[in-house]
């Protein structure tokens, strides 16, 4: 194996394998199951389907009495139900909560923000005090810059190998063996 191909192979292996300190302590996945958060996708039918009805969330309470917060929550639920009748959706089934007096709809979370999104508070107040240092880089920044440098070196190597002088040098080597 020639030295340039060894260098390319070493660069690719170094970029693929995580370096020391970059291995996650817990395996990360894009889907995390949490019992208290449920995302339900409900298809919205067109206005031509006549049998579609909406149902308000089912409330659970031990004594059957509504407290002040439950009454306020029921009022909000009734307002939401009135708004939902203008835009009917299919019934996903009865939604009940294991907690006292809370609707199951409160457990539904909104979709997560995009991958590169950072809230403004994180940008203004970094979590690590070393982040203010000009010599501190997080792992993702180092990996991105490393990939950029590797790509530039790879393309530069290809340009050098395919330039006229390298072709002349290889012809000189071939002529020497004759």
Curated annotation (Swiss-Prot):
* Composition bias type Polar residues, residue spans: 29-58
- In this chain, composition skew of type Low complexity spans 70-79
Q: Where are the transmembrane segments?
A: 147-164
Signal peptide residues are 1-21
Q: What is the protein's membrane topology class?
A: Single-pass type I membrane protein
GO BP annotations, alphabetical order: positive regulation of sodium ion export across plasma membrane; potassium ion transport; sodium ion transport
Superkingdom in the source lineage: Eukaryota
Give the Gene3D superfamilies listed for this entry.
Single helix bin
**Which cellular components does GO assign to this protein?**
basolateral plasma membrane; membrane; plasma membrane
Q: Which PANTHER family match?
A: FXYD DOMAIN-CONTAINING ION TRANSPORT REGULATOR 5, SODIUM/POTASSIUM-TRANSPORTING ATPASE SUBUNIT GAMMA
Q: What does this protein do?
A: Associates with and regulates the activity of the sodium/potassium-transporting ATPase (NKA) which catalyzes the hydrolysis of ATP coupled with the exchange of Na(+) and K(+) ions across the plasma membrane. May increase NKA activity by increasing the apparent affinity for Na(+). Involved in down-regulation of E-cadherin which results in reduced cell adhesion. Promotes metastasis.
- UniProt protein name: FXYD domain-containing ion transport regulator 5
Q: Which organism is it from?
A: Rattus norvegicus (Rat)
């Amino acid at each position: 194996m020639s030295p340039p191909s060894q260098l390319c192979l070493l660069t690719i292996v170094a970029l693929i394998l995580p370096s020391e300190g970059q291995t996650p302590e817990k395996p990360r996945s894009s889907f995390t199951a949490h019992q208290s958060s449920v995302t339900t996708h409900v298809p919205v039918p067109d206005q031509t389907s006549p049998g579609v009805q909406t149902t308000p969330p089912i409330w659970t309470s031990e004594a059957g009495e509504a407290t002040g917060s439950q009454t306020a929550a029921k009022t909000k639920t009734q307002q939401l139900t009135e708004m939902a009748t203008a835009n009917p959706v299919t019934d996903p089934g009865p939604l009940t909560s294991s907690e006292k007096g809370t609707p199951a709809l409160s457990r539904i979370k909104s979709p997560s923000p995009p991958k590169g999104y950072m809230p403004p508070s994180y940008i203004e107040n970094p979590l690590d005090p070393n982040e203010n240092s000009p010599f501190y880089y997080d792992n993702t920044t180092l990996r991105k810059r490393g990939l950029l440098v590797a790509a530039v070196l790879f393309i530069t190597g290809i340009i050098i190998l395919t330039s006229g002088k390298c072709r002349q040098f290889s012809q000189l080597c071939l002529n020497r063996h004759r």
